[in-house]
Design a protein with these regions (language model features):
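Bacterial N-terminal signal peptides that target proteins for export
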Residues: 7, 11-27
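Residue-level detector of alpha-helix boundary/anchor positions
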Residues: 7-8, 13, 33, 213, ...
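Bacterial N-terminal signal peptides
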Residues: 25-36
């Protein structure tokens, strides 16, 4: 059973606990390392072809002449006919435009993530329909991406437990998180201070993601600088935190994505450490790590894990080096892996974010090629190899 907001401890008390924890961990680290379950980094499990077909040319360009999509950093399928996409501005195209241009900058050798001199902060958030046609462009909020030195928006998420379906946009460069109304008409919350990195209760250091608990609380992956997971109430007010920099159990080197699973499990992509870490929110936590969070497992052997979806019985991770999709059970055993090709017009450089709609269609955002693609299950696909919708507690 999850612990409610009323049982959250004060920040001062938590920091005191963490100080003791860090000192104690130096003494018992070897023992803890032995007892924490770790998935083998050598066992890759079964591998095979993708169970999906790519819908070529799905993401329809709409930019003004001379521009194309930027890095598609976030994608969230609210429904099969309303898909949110966050992009890191648009990319200026060369003049004259090469004949091989196919509607996305990767087709002419431009890297939307790395060729930053071509970036312009416009059309950073959009929705498209199931055919990839533009529904809305929320350019009224482009100013929330401007005036920062870095890649900008990183994720877009909506809580399945929020009746208002508020839209959370994480901007790593500005060290801020914005919460918008579902129709895009209002900026409801601004968390963090513009272009000010910090590690206290009101600041972030390049936040990366959010995940949502059934009781309304929010987990924030804070992220690339602070290497901590913050627990807040539904309006982003600080309650507690856990984590810290390092490569031991419960420590992080860049938390890139978060997801919630059954029985209070928390899954965190520990990117630079090349692993997934698993925690549990529980009334029965020992308190050695955090008053209401226990560390369960470390799953090693990833190259550069980018995003994940947790279902009722499994976890899917998009990984780089090489680019692949990996299915695991809740013990960290690899059940299936399919490699993602960069060949041809439907190739990927990375699947930075992915989402599944209620019809089983998969959407993958490419932060480097600069586009989002839709993948539909093959007619003869084994249902066990398809990515199901994210876990939602009934």
């Amino acid at each position: 059973m999850l612990i409610g907001d009323n049982l959250s401890l004060s920040a001062a008390h938590l920091r005191k606990d963490f100080g003791v924890m860090q000192f104690t961990s130096l003494i018992v680290f070897g023992l803890v390392f032995l007892v924490v379950p770790m998935a083998s980094s050598q066992d890759l499990g079964p591998t095979g072809p993708s169970p999906y077909d790519v819908v070529e040319g799905w993401h329809k360009p709409f930019a003004a002449e001379g521009f194309a999509f930027g890095g598609n950093s976030g994608v969230f399928a609210e429904s099969p006919n309303r898909i949110f996409i966050s992009q890191r501005g648009e990319t200026k195209l060369p003049t004259p435009l090469p004949l091989e241009f196919a509607g996305y900058v990767g087709s002419i050798g431009i890297n939307a993530l790395r060729d930053t001199e071509l970036r312009t902060w416009q059309n950073c958030l959009m929705t498209v329909d199931g055919n990839g046609n533009l529904l809305e462009v929320w350019n009224q909020w482009d100013h929330l991406c401007e005036d920062s030195d870095g890649p900008g928006p990183h994720r877009v998420r909506i809580s399945p437990y929020d009746p208002e379906r508020r839209v959370w946009v994480i901007n790593e460069s500005r060290h801020q998180i914005f919460v918008l109304s579902n129709d895009g008409s209002e900026l409801l919350l601004t968390l963090g201070e513009k272009n000010v990195s910090g590690s206290d209760e009101t600041h972030f250091g390049r936040p990366q993601d959010v995940a949502f608990l059934p009781d309304g609380r929010v987990l924030i992956a804070d992220g690339l600088d602070n290497h901590r997971i913050i627990i807040t109430d539904s309006n982003g007010n600080y309650l507690s935190e856990f984590g810290g920099f390092g490569d031991g159990p419960g420590q992080f080197n860049g938390i890139h994505a978060l997801a919630i699973g059954p029985d209070g499990r928390i899954f965190a992509l520990d990117r630079a450490n090349g692993r997934v870490q698993v925690f549990r929110l529980t009334n029965d936590a020992s308190g050695e790590y955090h008053p209401e969070v226990e560390h369960i497992a470390v799953w090693s052997g990833f190259g550069l894990p980018l995003d994940l979806i947790v279902n009722e019985e499994s976890v899917w991770v998009s990984d780089l080096r090489p680019l692949k999709m990996v299915k695991l059970d809740f013990d960290g055993n690899r059940l299936y892996t399919w490699n993602v090709s960069n060949d041809g017009p439907s190739g990927y450089l990375e699947i930075h974010a992915f989402s599944v709609d209620t019809d089983g269609n998969l959407y993958g955002g490419d932060n480097q090629h600069g586009r989002t693609q839709k993948l539909i299950p093959k007619a003869n696909a084994d249902p066990r190899l398809l990515i199901g919708p994210p876990f939602v507690q009934e």
